[in-house]
């Protein structure tokens, strides 16, 4: 579950993630990956849109950050419908890319809880103009099953 704010909108998101079977220990920390799927509702000043996305993400836990801290980043594909349109911005495509970077922390007896602060950018990658993009600052809570 995550909530976010942008210049022209607010978002509420639900989703699921699945850890990859791959992980690697490097000199400067541990890297793992996961698939993230999400459904969001964006509320803007002129209309509401639904966002569906799938994102592969990499997570880095630096050596010395033993208390569950991590840094994460990913780039995925999204469908936003109807096309995002506010008084200030108008997307020209329904298909968009979404990339994010986050810092977060796992906690709980079994590390089953997690929070993160994320910056996420959506745009069509210059497939068509206009391509103003939208940036969200998001707070995310995850409960691992």
Would you name each region that the model predicts?
Residues 17-19, 23, 57-61, 96, ...:
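Transmembrane beta-barrel domains of outer membrane proteins
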Residues 1, 28-37, 52-54, 69-75, ...:
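Transmembrane beta-strands of outer-membrane beta-barrel proteins
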Residues 21-31, 46, 63-69, 109-112:
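Short loop/turn motifs that connect adjacent beta-strands in outer-membrane beta-barrel proteins
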Residues 59-104:
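Surface-exposed, polar helix/loop patches in the mature regions of secreted/periplasmic/lumenal proteins
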Residues 3-9, 18-20, 37-43, 75-81, ...:
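Transmembrane beta-strands of outer-membrane beta-barrel pores
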Residues 3-13, 42-49, 65, 126-132:
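Solvent-exposed loop/turn segments connecting transmembrane beta-strands
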Residues 14, 133-145:
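Outer-membrane beta-barrel "beta-signal"
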Residues 25, 37-51, 73-89:
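Outer-membrane beta-barrel translocator/channel fold
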């Amino acid at each position: 579950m995550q909530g976010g704010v942008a210049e022209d909108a607010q978002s509420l998101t639900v989703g699921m993630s699945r850890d990859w079977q791959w992980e690697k220990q490097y000199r400067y920390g541990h890297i793992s990956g996961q698939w993230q799927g999400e459904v969001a509702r964006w509320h803007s000043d002129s209309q509401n849109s639904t966002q569906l996305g799938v994102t592969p993400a990499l997570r880095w836990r630096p050596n010395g950050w033993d208390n569950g801290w991590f840094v994460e980043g990913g780039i995925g594909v999204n469908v936003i419908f109807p096309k995002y349109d506010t008084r200030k911005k108008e997307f020209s495509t329904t298909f968009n890319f979404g990339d994010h970077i986050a810092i977060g922390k796992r906690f709980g007896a079994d590390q089953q809880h997690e929070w993160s602060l994320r910056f996420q950018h959506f745009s069509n990658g210059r497939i068509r103009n206009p391509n103003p993009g939208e940036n969200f600052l998001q707070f995310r809570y995850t409960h691992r099953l």
